Amino acid sequence: MQAQIVNKIFEIFSKNNPSPKTELIYKNDFTLLVAVMLSAQATDISVNLATKSLFETYDTTEKILELGEDGLKKYIKSIGLFNSKAKNIIALCKILISNYQSSVPNDFKELIKLPGVGRKTANVVLNCLFGMPTMAVDTHVFRVAKRIGLARGNSPEIVEKELLQIINEKWLTHAHHWLILHGRYICKARKPDCDICPIKEYCEYYNSPIISK
């Protein structure tokens, strides 16, 4: 896709939503990290429902450790993979306390050393908490980027690299939020709402001859 078309797409995203934010609800740096970890293979809605009562009382590494793994499971049992997520969160709390004075590190390499933290989680944290121009590739970003024509890769990591190369730096701070929200509400997995899509004239999928309009 030509750079001028990519710029036009993100100009439209920016005009329609100048300051996009994560839809995960959190109280501080630590609770955002926990929420993002819980969001793996789960919806933001389901995570917010589970963490509402959890974060009201347990919003620090020390408090989560006091709650314990079994106690944590009771709060997050409605979320997929809650057993392994609870185990990772408890292990993560211990490391944050011992190695980082309970603070969330602002370094990618340090973040991905933590239990349960992969590339996507690390990139979300760096972007949302520290304003870094990262590209967190979840299922929405992966699908939308390939459907629009922004990327061709067959893995999230390759798509991440492609997007970082093709998207102008001035858009990168908000780019992954725009792509997520576009995928969540318009460019849906099974049936994209092309009729209301603000970027359809630039979309390879929409302009494909095999697509009925």
From Swiss-Prot:
Keywords: 4Fe-4S, DNA damage, DNA repair, DNA-binding, Glycosidase, Hydrolase, Iron, Iron-sulfur, Lyase, Metal-binding
Family membership: Belongs to the Nth/MutY family.
Function: DNA repair enzyme that has both DNA N-glycosylase activity and AP-lyase activity. The DNA N-glycosylase activity releases various damaged pyrimidines from DNA by cleaving the N-glycosidic bond, leaving an AP (apurinic/apyrimidinic) site. The AP-lyase activity cleaves the phosphodiester bond 3' to the AP site by a beta-elimination, leaving a 3'-terminal unsaturated sugar and a product with a terminal 5'-phosphate.
Gene that this sequence comes from: nth
Record-linked Gene3D superfamilies: Helix-hairpin-Helix base-excision DNA repair enzymes (C-terminal), Hypothetical protein, domain 2
HAMAP family, A to Z: Nth
Keyword Isomerase set for record: no
Swiss-Prot/TrEMBL cofactor(s): [4Fe-4S] cluster
Binding locations of [4Fe-4S] cluster: C187, C194, C197, C203
Protein name (record): Endonuclease III
Enzyme Commission code: 4.2.99.18
GO molecular function: 4 iron, 4 sulfur cluster binding; class I DNA-(apurinic or apyrimidinic site) endonuclease activity; DNA binding; DNA N-glycosylase activity; metal ion binding
Superkingdom of this protein's organism: Bacteria
Location of the HhH domain: 108-127
Cofactor binding comment, as recorded: Binds 1 [4Fe-4S] cluster.
This protein's record includes keyword Iron-sulfur: yes
GO biological process, one term: base-excision repair, AP site formation
Catalyzed reactions: 2'-deoxyribonucleotide-(2'-deoxyribose 5'-phosphate)-2'-deoxyribonucleotide-DNA = a 3'-end 2'-deoxyribonucleotide-(2,3-dehydro-2,3-deoxyribose 5'-phosphate)-DNA + a 5'-end 5'-phospho-2'-deoxyribonucleoside-DNA + H(+)
Organism annotation: Rickettsia felis (strain ATCC VR-1525 / URRWXCal2)
